[in-house]
Design a protein with these regions (language model features):
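Short secondary-structure junctions
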Residues: 138-149, 191
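Short edge beta-strands and adjacent turn/loop segments
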Residues: 148-164
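Short, hydrophobic beta-strand segments
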Residues: 161-174
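Solvent-exposed, non-transmembrane alpha-helical starts
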Residues: 175-181
Length: 191
């Protein structure tokens, strides 16, 4: 009976993977604890064959995927975008209230802020103006899917400063283009 252990485990795992639609050929998966990060090429009784992005091949027993965790990127591939979530740290000592002159300068020099009006009774800070600008800039870009979440938030401050988390979805999900898009966007924010 021990001779057939891998075959039996593979068979049961294969049924679980199929019945629960956990994995299909063509899916991009990553398997923690292994070097598997690529496209599923083949699923057999005893192995799942994955072509990694560096063109190496990984083979993993199906029962490993059922008994441990793995990440299937199919949901991202089939969705309307690929998530970008990064933070920009602001020096806590540079955050200050905006004077009326500062607000007027922002409105004149930054077209996206031309129609900005703070809530009544609120004196905005330069950090708040940056968050408003980031949101308006992202919503103006055709590469950003504004039908999905777009959230600009201030996180708990750290020894590195105050993180402004920028969370949005790129319409383009192709890895190379996705990296270029997010790099271009963050280059703009850094400048």
């Amino acid at each position: 009976m021990l001779v057939f252990k891998d075959t039996i485990l593979g068979f049961v795992a294969g049924i679980q993977l199929s019945a629960n639609d956990m994995l299909r050929p063509g899916d991009w998966i990553t398997v923690p604890g292994s070097n598997a990060n690529g496209i599923v090429q083949e699923i057999t009784l005893n192995t799942v064959k994955i072509q990694n992005f560096d063109n190496t091949i990984s083979t993993i027993p199906p029962y490993t995927l059922v008994s441990a965790s793995f990440q299937n990127w199919r949901g991202m591939v089939e969705s309307g975008g690929r998530r970008v979530m990064k933070s920009i740290f602001l020096d806590l000592n540079t955050i200050k209230f905006c004077t009326p002159d500062m607000l007027n300068t922002f409105r004149k020099e930054i077209p996206l802020l031309a129609d900005y009006k703070p809530d009544e009774g609120v004196t905005p800070t330069n950090s708040q103006m940056f968050r408003v600008y980031v949101e308006k800039y992202l919503t103006s870009l055709p590469v950003v899917n504004t039908d999905l979440d777009l959230i600009i938030s201030q996180l708990q401050s750290t020894e590195y400063g105050v993180p402004i988390q920028i969370y949005f979805f790129s319409r383009n999900k192709i890895w190379k283009e996705y990296e270029r898009i997010q790099s271009d966007i963050f280059d703009h924010f850094f400048a």
